[in-house]
């Protein structure tokens, strides 16, 4: 596994109070071609935590319209990361 690729996999945190506070689950926007083992290694390496499980889903981009011009938002991939008990990520601080 290439170290550079691990740091490029996580694009942005998808912050929601419901996910983090109630279930200890964190949501990230990831590269569309990222696999579950790659996402797990990337989170463990960047945040120094133990990952229990990873679930992913592909989100289809919405069609948009500005007056008569029609467009489309990009498709993206979302990863739900469940941490082991006792592990926590402070997303606001970055690490």
Swiss-Prot record:
GO terms for cellular component: ribonucleoprotein complex; ribosome. One of its GO terms (molecular function) is rRNA binding. InterPro entries: Nucleotide-bd_a/b_plait_sf (IPR012677), Ribosomal_uL23-like (IPR013025), Ribosomal_uL23/eL15/eS24_sf (IPR012678). GO terms for biological process: translation. Gene3D superfamilies: 3.30.70.330. NCBIfam families: PRK05738.1-3 (NF004359), PRK05738.2-4 (NF004363). Part of the 50S ribosomal subunit. Contacts protein L29, and trigger factor when it is bound to the ribosome. This is Large ribosomal subunit protein uL23. It comes from Coxiella burnetii (strain Dugway 5J108-111).
């Amino acid at each position: 596994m290439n170290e550079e690729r691990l740091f490029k996999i996580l694009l942005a945190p998808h912050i929601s109070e419901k996910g983090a506070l109630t279930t200890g689950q964190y949501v990230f926007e990831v590269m569309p071609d990222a696999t579950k083992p790659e996402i797990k290694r990337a989170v463990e390496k960047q945040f120094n935590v133990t990952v229990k499980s990873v679930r992913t889903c592909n989100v289809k981009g919405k069609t948009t319209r500005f007056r008569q011009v029609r467009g489309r938002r990009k498709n993206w991939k979302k990863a739900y990361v469940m941490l082991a008990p006792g592990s926590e990520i402070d997303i606001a601080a970055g690490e």
